[in-house]
Amino acid sequence: MGRKWANIVAKKTAKDGATSKVYAKFGVEIYVAAKQGEPDPELNTTLKFVIDRAKQAQVPKHVIDKAIDKAKGNTDETFVEGRYEGFGPNGSMIIVDTLTSNVNRTAANVRTAYGKNGGNMGASGSVSYLFDKKGVIVFAGDDADSVFEQLLEADVDVDDVEAEEGTITVYTAPTDLHKGIQALRDNGVEEFQVTELEMIPQSEVVLEGDDLETFEKLIDALESDDDVQKVYHNVADF
């Protein structure tokens, strides 16, 4: 499973890197985090978390600095979080999280992306109840039992720890993600491949052939929207 999360980050970075979409999306997220609190990551836990995630996605330092500098200025641009749930082919389910300065534009764009690519946007709550929100931490290692004990000793609410092919994946309660990261740092982990809040499907579906091709086009259309920050789904091995 750890390889899955690392592959998702690598795939997204490779796909978006050429057009700098991933940079722009992190730029907005960093700006919002800095604007809502102190523009200093040492004094703003949320900002530090976003910056760490940006670095994992290979976002350049100048992009991070520019977003923080923008937040320090007099701009009054505001962004609103949104969530759009829907369905793809053959039992696939999708959750789209957005961050936008124009809610009407974003809602229309997401609905169009669903409708023109074999999907169907549903009502709020139509899909999310079949997903669980968890903290996901991925780093190099192979001793899951030791990591589990370290997290318990640090009073971290940990759901599971998996080891696979030299990679450790930790699942925490969403409220304990930051606490888990700090506990691992305190125990010598210096570099993380993934530190994310994720929506984990309670069960997965397998798509093949035309269904898989349609689903891939649908996900690409959703992720290509500038206002879309995260896309979650229940399709296995994708």
Curated annotation (Swiss-Prot):
It is found in: Cytoplasm. Disulfide bonds: none annotated. It comes from the Bacteria. Its main location: cytoplasm. SUPFAM superfamilies: YebC-like (SSF75625). One of its GO terms (molecular function) is DNA binding. It holds the Pfam family TACO1_YebC_N. GO terms for cellular component: cytosol. GO terms for biological process: regulation of DNA-templated transcription. Keywords: Cytoplasm, DNA-binding, Transcription, Transcription regulation. NCBIfam families: PRK00110.1, PRK12378.1, YebC/PmpR family DNA-binding transcriptional regulator. Belongs to the TACO1 family. YeeN subfamily. This is Probable transcriptional regulatory protein SpyM51586.
